[in-house]
Amino acid sequence: MNIPMNIPAYAEIGITTNFSFLRGGSHPQDYVQQASELRLPVIGIADHNTLAGVVRAYKELGNPDVIHKPKLLIGSRLIFIDDTPDILVYPRDRAAYGRLCQLLTRGKRGDDTEKGECHLGLDDLVEFSEGQLLVLTLPHRFETDKALGVLDRLQRSRAEGVWLAASLLYRGDDKRRLGRLHRMAATARVPLLATNEVLYHHPARRPLQDVLTCVREKATVDAIGKRLEANAERYLKPAAEMARLFRELPEAVAETMRFSKRITFSLDQLKYQYPDEPVPPGKTAQQHLEDLTWAGVQQHFPGEIDATLRATLRKE
């Protein structure tokens, strides 16, 4: 597929995979393959309160059939219990990734948290915000003052940066909504970031995503009504299509690449680090291990032990 030279580069941020239970209609691998076909330079996975989907996307980058390998941004979409709108969180570096993991762990380990739940409030995010790139996403209908309050709180945190997401999903009032978002971003002095709020890699997956929504909402296709998406637009779109949609605000498309360039973290930076063992002064770790072993032998086998067992212990 040839991309015209005058089409600006575009990074799709905030992709939902099937690791967001009963929400995403495509596998992480599907997105990598589709991004390669579309020659998108960057894609950002952000599943609901989890980092689970990014591993399979990362592994797919090693598939030789993926010719044009996109840069993979590792993030999560935080869903809050205190009425805060969803926020996309992307760690800038390895240290920020660790803080995001700690934040998600806190949300899943509360005393009143059931399996599969994640209880987080805006205060929790602010506490772990250092080094994070934060993108506020808003529902179709939102209160401007409340959204501005959230943006202000995020800007006063230790985050690496704050953005406001903007999408055009053919819902009938896109132009008016985009105007509101543009004015809000100007008021808050944050950049507007284009996104298609992707739920599946190709429009053909829309029927599957509808079924997932019905299962989640415990309703039949006939009865679910407006809880389904109005169309099949929430797929991974080529840069040319996003540029056309945002032709009145091209900066929102350009901002996606500026956003992605600020992120240096990649999963290949993660390596297992064996924890330091407490060792008595003057002893090596091996010597201390041998001392503990022989102390255990005396505890479990008091007195003399036979030569065979002694030889086995020395070998081990």
Residue ranges of each PLM-predicted region?
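Phosphodiester-processing cores and adjacent nucleic acid-binding clamps
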Residues: 1-316
